[in-house]
Curated annotation (Swiss-Prot):
Protein name (record): Protein translocase subunit SecA
Naturally occurring in which organism (per UniProt): Rhodobacter capsulatus
GO biological process: intracellular protein transmembrane transport; protein import; protein targeting; protein transport by the Sec complex
Swiss-Prot/TrEMBL keywords: ATP-binding, Cell inner membrane, Cell membrane, Cytoplasm, Membrane, Metal-binding, Nucleotide-binding, Protein transport, Translocase, Translocation, Transport, Zinc
Catalysed conversion reaction: ATP + H2O + cellular proteinSide 1 = ADP + phosphate + cellular proteinSide 2
Length: 904
């Protein structure tokens, strides 16, 4: 009997069907304009862009311009690339412009789709960011689609790591900018560590289109981007504690593989206490439970996790004396990414490579909070529907399935479940051999480098030629993927998410043409292309007859979405194909999430060795397990976001205030307000309201103003006068400190004083924010234990982090007032002595034979900072944070960025 839901869908259609239906009239209007736009000259296409820009900037809505803009963009793409967008691609572009996630299957041309909403929104003049998962794709897409934008009269830039500053600023200043999610996030953090607006890279966050949006906004959501600096070196401690792990037995610890956590049992704690005390690392009578043991407990716990939960060639690789993490979702190496809390150092100790010092966080942001900065956000992926709830809850993004241009002809078969991994891999080899013999290309999906290389050895033993694509071979990635659809090809790959290159049946024509032209520069390119296209057509037909691409997965992933991405590599643009998952009860997902019931069923069925169970019930059971894991991960991310939102509000407040300070010339007013609050606080502390004069702590107040403002005030004389109360005292102190600052301003000059105030203010904000981040990290690590006392950890975190934030602001006011109180102009004698020392240092550096030139006179702002207590010219740690364009504090006369700043 048919359910009511099924009948309702047949009668009224699904919500997705209705969304698609609403775009059809717009697509029809765009198609109706096509003949007129085909007649335009190239110059007229650019003129159309200028007209649309003028209308957008005059206030006409982008929705009103959509039809003409899409028609213009389609014609430009046809001329620049020889590609005419399908109606389904126009639909995808419309959904993106409306701020949705467009789910488009592999091979449907997502790269071209993004040009339509990017062009339309760029007309507003605020810049559009197109976000990719790696630098290769950012460069490739900007170069490829840049031809379309230039044909339309717009500029296109690409952002990449270690790019020169001027080039990066120009890329962000372009109408459309391609960049990776990592680089965008790091540049946002770097911008908020700059000392002037002119040095910043990014404009306002207007509109971003995120490719592989599920990978970036869900898989990477829990990963914070952190800019950090080194802390003290503890490498000896990591090595020492690592040596204890091999002595542990299973009774000494408990593992939680679901949450990647490890804890010591009572037996384990007793064993470690005895060993550590015997070796002198733990004093006699001191327990691991004592507060003094916190550091040892933390680091030996991380050593346990490193050995028991993180595995070489699965979670990381060892290369060039370094531990490089592997992205569990894409199989790519993540160079430069490090685990926090000493875990990375514990893995380095385990693998006997050089241990890098732990880092202190200077600035951080999560992708969840970075991408929520944009006025409008959209995304593209082949698999989003399973995560629609999360996209809606966290990012307020709807998910729309865009129809394929041609119906999907891939056959998705039921999973085959074997009892043991040995039986499973034997069946996998047989299936690969059968497909290879009939010429069907096979893509074999594995979950780790270790398993991909084990399977490779098994295929070698059978004499089957194949390619392996994992984190070790990522340089040959494009070539391996391009060949994966050729007749009889066998390709073993770790997770294929975000690979960015389509597997085309018969091979990639364009790549083959470019290779041949490069190898035979004297041959006619047209002849090479014609020959290769003919060869490709013949090979493609044979592959189609063999059944198209066979996707063979050797394990299910925790996420259904990753499995669907792998399936989606087959059956692109209506091609035939087949997908099949081979599983065993020893697989991680089955083992961790309960294969006991299935084991019982298999036993009752009396299965023999090598036999598999194939039934829709098995698929449903596994998908339920995956849905449970996805739900748990979603809950984690949601909870983490609630905590991060607390810090995010504070981050936005600090970064916003910092930006205002960089943009304003009225610094003295901000500084005066801070000084006044310090005065009010100190007077309230030492001369409380409604107290008598003889109750005031005059000497304490005098010492406090000397310490915090650098001024010795005649407070005792003022207090002895008739009629002096707290208000009178406040007025006199304020007038005295204002007068001192006025004298300094006159001595330095108003412009120089403004520079000094701005530098001190920005440096102090940065230093205090860094300290605050460390404090919040510590609070975050311990607040979870409040749950044992029946208190809500999130509520406690909100309350205490707000108190810490207020305390940081108080400390900021005191520090700025104190540093400004300490600066003074140099006397002529001091200045002459400083110049003499600089000249001597230069002479020593350049050699006695070369007479040293007298160094260039330093700006007063630098002289003032040099005069501050604690400043040592030869010690960069006492220089504070000079602006990159300031003269270097070492006295070389060079700009900081060309001297010591270049080494930083």
């Amino acid at each position: 009997m048919l359910g009511l839901g099924y009948i309702g869908r047949k009668l009224f259609g699904t919500p997705n069907d209705r969304k698609v239906k609403r775009t059809r009239p717009l697509v029809a209007k765009i198609n109706a304009l096509e003949p007129a736009f085909e007649k335009l000259s190239d110059a007229e296409i650019v003129a159309k862009t200028r007209e649309l820009q003028a209308r957008a900037q005059a206030g006409e809505s982008l929705d009103a311009l959509l039809v003409e803009a899409f028609a213009n963009c389609r014609e430009a793409a046809r001329r620049a690339l020889g590609l005419r967008a399908f109606d389904t691609q126009l639909m995808g572009g419309i959904f993106l412009h409306q701020g949705n996630i467009a789910e488009m299957k592999t091979g449907e041309g997502k790269t071209l789709v993004a040009t339509f909403p990017a062009y339309l929104n760029a007309l507003a003049g605020k810049g559009v960011h197109i976000v990719t998962v790696n630098d290769y794709l950012a460069r490739r897409d900007s170069e490829w689609m840049g031809k379309v934008y230039r044909h339309l009269g717009l500029t296109c830039g690409v952002v990449y790591p270690f790019q020169p500053d001027d080039e990066k600023r120009a890329a962000y200043g372009a109408d459309i900018t391609y960049a990776t999610n990592n680089e965008l996030g790091f540049d946002y953090l770097r911008d908020n560590m700059k000392s002037s607006v002119a040095e910043m890279y990014q404009r306002d966050h207007f509109f971003a289109i995120v490719d592989e949006v599920d990978s970036i906004l869900i898989d990477e959501a829990r990963t914070p981007l952190i800019i950090s600096g080194p802390s003290q070196d503890r490498s000896d401690m990591y090595r020492t504690l690592d040596a204890y792990i091999p002595f542990l037995t299973e009774e000494h610890y408990k593992l939680d593989e679901k949450q990647r956590n490890a804890t010591f049992t009572e037996e384990g704690n007793e064993f470690l206490e005895q060993k550590l005390q015997a070796d002198g690392l733990l004093p006699e009578g001191q327990s691991l439970y004592d507060p003094e043991s916190t550091t040892i407990v933390h680091h030996i716990g991380q050593a346990l996790r490193a050995h028991k939960l993180f595995f070489k060639d699965q979670n990381y690789v060892v290369t060039d004396d370094e531990i490089v993490l592997i992205d569990e979702f894409t199989g790519r190496m993540m160079k430069g990414r490090r685990l926090s809390d000493g875990l990375h150092q514990a893995i380095e100790a385990k693998e006997r490579v050089t241990i890098q010092p732990e880092n202190v966080t200077l600035a951080s942001v999560t992708f969840q909070n970075y991408f929520r900065l944009y006025e409008k956000l959209a995304g593209m992926t082949g698999t989003a529907v399973t995560e629609a709830e999360e996209f809606g809850d966290i990012y307020k993004l709807g998910v729309v399935e865009v129809p394929t241009n041609r119906p999907v002809a891939r056959k998705d078969e039921h999973d085959r479940v074997y009892r043991t991994a040995k039986e499973k891999y034997a069946a996998v080899i047989e299936a690969i051999k059968t497909a290879h013999e009939k010429g069907q290309p096979t893509l074999v999906g594995t979950t780790s480098i270790e398993k991909s290389e084990m399977l490779s050895e098994m295929l070698k033993a059978e004499g089957l030629p194949h390619n392996v694509l994992n984190a070790r071979q990522h340089e040959q990635e494009a070539q391996i993927v391009a060949d994966a659809g050729r007749l009889g090809a066998i390709t073993i790959a770790t997770n294929m998410a975000g690979r960015g290159t389509d597997i085309q049946l018969g091979g990639n024509v364009e790549m083959k043409v470019q290779e041949e032209i490069a190898a035979n520069p004297e041959a006619a390119p047209e002849e090479i292309r014609a020959r290769i296209e003919a060869e490709h057509a013949a090979e493609k037909q044979k592959v189609i007859e063999a059944g198209g691409l066979f996707v063979l997965a050797t394990e299910r992933h925790e996420s259904r979405r990753i499995d669907n991405q792998l399936r989606g590599r087959s059956g692109r643009q209506g091609d035939p194909g087949r997908s099949l998952f081979f599983l065993s009860l020893e697989d991680d997902l089955m083992r961790i999430f309960g294969s006991d019931r299935l084991e019982g069923v298999l036993s009752k069925l009396g299965m023999k060795e090598g036999e598999a169970i194939i039934h829709p019930w098995v698929n449903k059971s596994l998908e339920r397990a995956q849905a449970k894991v996805e739900g748990r991960n979603f809950d984690w991310r949601k909870q983490l976001l609630k905590f991060d939102d607390v810090m995010n509000d504070q981050r936005k407040a600090v970064f916003g205030q910092r930006r205002e300070i960089m943009e304003t010339d009225e610094i003295s007013e901000i500084v005066a307000d801070m000084r006044q609050q310090v005065i009010d606080d100190l007077i309230d502390d030492f001369a409380p309201p409604k107290s008598y004069v003889d109750q005031w702590d005059i000497e304490g107040m005098r010492a406090a103003f000397i310490d915090h403002a650098g001024v010795d005030l005649p407070l005792a004389d003022w207090a002895a006068e008739e009629g002096v109360d707290q208000d009178v005292l406040r007025e006199r102190v304020t007038a005295a400190l204002d007068a001192v600052m006025a004298q300094k301003t006159e001595a330095f000059g108003a412009e120089t004083m403004r520079v000094i105030e701005k530098q001190i203010l920005l440096q102090t904000i940065d230093a205090k924010w860094r300290e605050h981040l460390v404090t919040l990290e510590h609070l975050r690590s311990v607040v979870g234990f409040r749950g044992y006392a029946q208190r809500d950890p999130l509520s406690e975190y909100k309350t205490e982090s707000f108190q810490l934030f207020e305390s940081m602001l108080d400390s900021l006011r005191y520090e700025v007032t104190k540093r400004l109180g300490q600066i003074r102009p140099m006397s002529d004698e001091e200045r002459a002595e400083m110049l003499r020392q600089q000249a001597a240092a230069l002479a020593a550096a350049e050699g006695a034979a070369d007479p040293a030139e007298a160094p260039a006179p330093q700006p007063a702002a630098q002289v003032a900072l040099a005069a501050a207590p604690g400043f040592v010219e030869s010690d960069p740690t006492t220089w504070g944070e000079p602006s990159r364009n300031d003269p270097c504090p070492c006295g070389s006369g060079e700009k900081f960025k060309h001297c010591h700043g270049r080494l930083a």
